[in-house]
């Protein structure tokens, strides 16, 4: 889905993921966009420091990330 990065193999195959934040926003306009770090099994919300900043992450919809088994990196990001 537009993610030509080596870590893409670590992502859940059923979860749509995106290289660019705008792509994710367009795919899920009514859901929050999160930054998924597949190697850690976590996601960061847009209010967190590492959102979009790690070298091995990708953008995804919150609902899809949670359905695929990823969890919030902190209690604050849960449900945002």
PLM features per residue range, with description:
Residues 5-80:
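Mature, structured domains enriched in cysteine- and short glycine motifs
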Residues 1-2:
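Bacterial N-terminal signal peptides
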């Amino acid at each position: 889905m537009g993610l030509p990065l080596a870590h893409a193999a670590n992502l859940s195959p059923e979860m749509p993921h995106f290289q660019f934040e705008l792509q994710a926003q367009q795919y899920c306009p009514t859901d929050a966009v999160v930054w998924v770090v597949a190697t850690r099994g976590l996601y960061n919300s847009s209010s967190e420091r590492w959102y979009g900043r790690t070298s091995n992450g990708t953008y995804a919809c919150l609902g899809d990330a949670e359905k695929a088994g990823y969890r919030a990196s902190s209690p604050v990001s849960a449900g945002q």
